Structures are given as structure tokens and as C-alpha cells.
Amino acid sequence: MAGGGGGGGRGEGEGRAATGKRERIAIRRIDNLAARQVTFSKRRRGLFKKAEELSILCDAEVGLVVFSATGKLFQFASTSMEQIIDRYNSHSKTLQRAEPSQLDLQGEDSSTCARLKEELAETSLRLRQMRGEELHRLNVEQLQELEKSLESGLGSVLKTKSKKILDEIDGLERKRMQLIEENLRLKEQLQVSRMSRMEEMQPGPDSEIVYEEGQSSESVTNASYPRPPPDNDYSSDTSLRLGLSLFSSK
């Protein structure tokens, strides 16, 4: 039987190793008193350890109070249990004072939300009817009112459209006049520039016409028409007189 028990133990171990899954413990009251006390001691230490880690890692103020089944007190406080309890009491009083106003605000918010939802539904239905949808719900009078509303809205649309078109036409006309004025101004500037250039090119009445290499008209005229040579008779008479005077002196 021992061998059979050993074989059964190995078989159970092999089955656990094969599955590789850890059995989940059902969360319920432990009937065995000794097992319950052992579990309480282990879980309490683990709970206090987690609370301490939370206070250190997250810089949180943690207070933990546990009573065993026999009424024994166990507690953990990251700072001071009295300080934590005082802080808890003051926070609870603040919450109690704020609860009525918060409830009122929640009631007001609920009523406002309901009213807004109703208005949104009515407006959405009105828009669909103006687009020609869901008209079967309306009677003759409601259809006539809808027709008047559409005609009035269409008139406003046409009026606004006409005004915008006229404004665009006026703007284009102003731009056209500006372009015409700018064109005339440029033409005048071009004409003035041409006149001034022509005046610069024409010589003045008292200025001498300059020909090649700085020669004036007078020098060019003299070069073109040389003066006649002196009279030969006059020069011969002068030579005779000079010869006679020289002969007499000898």
C-alpha cells in the first residue's frame, strides 16, 4: 500500500507538472478553526506589508485596522493612527456638508439636461420638416405655417444673396476705375519722359555744332574753303623796290 501510495503521489505530481496550472482556492469561510487562524495570520501580514509598500512607494498616508474573529485588534499606520482618524473624520464631515448641495446640483443638472434634450429633439424635427421630411405628422394649418416660414426664409436668402452680388459688382467697378486711373497716370509719365528726352537731344540756338573730334563749324568751314593766295603783282613790285635800294647803297 505504501508503494501504491507512492505511485499515486508521483502520478498526481506528474499530472500537476503536465498541466502546469495552479489550483485556485475558493474564496469562502474556512470551516477548520486552526486552518482559519493560520490563514488569517498569513493574510494579515501580507496585507500590512502591501499597505507599507503603498505608503513608501506612493508617499500615501495609509491607516489599516483589522479585528480578528476573536475581537483582537491589529492596526497599521504610515504616520499616526490618531492623525489619520482625525483627518478621516474631518473629511467625512466635509462630505456630509457638501452632499445636499451636490444632490441639488445633480437634480438641476438632470432637469437642465432633460430640457435641452427635448429642445434638441424639437429643433431636429423642425429642421427635417423644413427639408421636406416627416411631413405626414403635420396637419393643414401646420403645413401652411411651414410654407410661410419657408417663403420668408427664402426671401431673406434671396435678399442677402442679391446684396452680396451687388457688393461684389461695386467692388469690381472700383477696381476697374482704379486700373483706368493708373493706366492714364502711366501714360502721362511716359509722355513726359519722352518730351524731356527729345529736349535733351536738340541743340540750343547759341551753341556751335560740334563735328568730329571737337572741331567747330568755323574751323570746318576754313578747312573746306581756304583763303586765296596773295596777289603776284604786288609781291613782284615789292621785290624790285628792295633790289634797287640795295643796288643804290652799294
From Swiss-Prot:
Signal peptide: none annotated. Residues 106-198 form the K-box domain. InterPro entries: MADS-box/MEF2_TF, MEF2-like_N, TF_Kbox, TF_MADSbox, TF_MADSbox_sf. One of its GO terms (biological process) is positive regulation of transcription by RNA polymerase II. Its main location: nucleus. PROSITE patterns: K_BOX (PS51297), MADS_BOX_1 (PS00350), MADS_BOX_2 (PS50066). It is found in: Nucleus. Residues 1-20, 196-250 are annotated as: Disordered. It comes from the Eukaryota. Pfam families: K-box, SRF-TF. Residues 214-224 have a biased composition (Polar residues). SUPFAM superfamilies: SRF-like. Residues 11-20 have a biased composition (Basic and acidic residues). GO terms for molecular function: DNA-binding transcription factor activity; DNA-binding transcription factor activity, RNA polymerase II-specific; protein dimerization activity; RNA polymerase II cis-regulatory region sequence-specific DNA binding. Induction: Induced by dark. Down-regulated by treatments with auxin and brassinosteroid. Residues 1-10 have a biased composition (Gly residues). The keyword DNA-binding applies. GO terms for cellular component: nucleus. Residues 20-80 form the MADS-box domain. The keyword Transcription applies. Keywords: DNA-binding, Nucleus, Transcription, Transcription regulation. Expressed in roots, shoots and developing panicles. Expressed in mature stems and leaves, flowering panicles, developing seeds, and mature seeds. May interact with MADS18. Plants silencing MADS47 exhibit shortened primary roots, elongated coleoptiles and enhanced lamina joint inclinations. Plants silencing MADS47 display hypersensitivity to exogenous brassinolide in terms of lamina joint inclination and coleoptile elongation. Transcription factor that modulates expressions of multiple genes involved in cell signaling and gene transcription. Plays a negative regulatory role in brassinosteroid signaling. This is MADS-box transcription factor 47. It comes from Oryza sativa subsp. japonica. The lineage of its organism: Eukaryota, Viridiplantae, Streptophyta, Embryophyta, Tracheophyta.
